[in-house]
Amino acid sequence: MALIAKTRPQAALVLADGTVFQGESTGAAGLTVGEVVFNTSMTGYQEILTDPSYTGQLVTLTCAHIGNVGVNPEDMESNAIHAAGLIVKAAADVPSNWRARQSLPEALKDAGVKAICGIDTRALTIHLRTTGAQAGAIIAKQMGDELTDEDLQQALEAARSWGSMAGQDLAKTVTTDHVYDWTDGSWEPSREGEPAGFRRAAVFPYHVVAYDFGIKTNILRLLADRGIRVTVVPAQTPFEEAMKHQPDGIFLSNGPGDPAPCTYAIEVAHKAIAAK
């Protein structure tokens, strides 16, 4: 059985500066646009894709072969794929891991996420490193349809009209819409008669309020591993409202977009520092 499909639909990545990389689609068909960035991690593609911090970005993974271990529900950093698109050299269609529930291409298609493979990601990364992050568009065709000059022009126009991350407040688009408590720790394999799963501390001597500006579940798990019960609140929660939970501390998560327009977050930080 082939681990990588021999035939895929045609696709292209078009940068705002006019640079074109033609390859093949390994996700959903259609057009997507965003800021083209790269990540040099050797592992963790599922965590990267589901990290809310990558909202609005087309993520290039420099590791040459992506998708070997498939996708599973335990390694999600949120409840959905947040990256606007994925760019890889080679994508595995058949995963090889006992935890896998789907292949990466299947997960991308189910989520409607556009992705391109078969391009020189090293050349793209060097180009981005030299010119800086810029907007781009992935256009992916249906199987059997030809990629045309009109498609490339459409992608170029979409990339050039997208703009940049500057001034975009994306935190309020990815934050939770309700308050919730978190006590699940990190996932561990079975040991000493215990089944595999998420661990939970016996006691929680500390309580922290975490502001969700695009928080990853792994951050919450690591806090829980240390005996910290976390109350997660929406990004625009007033500081005074957060303090009604009587926490031992305040945690401000990272998130997507430009922090400058997030005046509500800046105000919380100022008040938390002043409160000591």
Spans of model-derived segments:
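RNA-binding accessory domains that recognize and position tRNA/RNA substrates
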Residues: A2-H245, G257-P259, E267
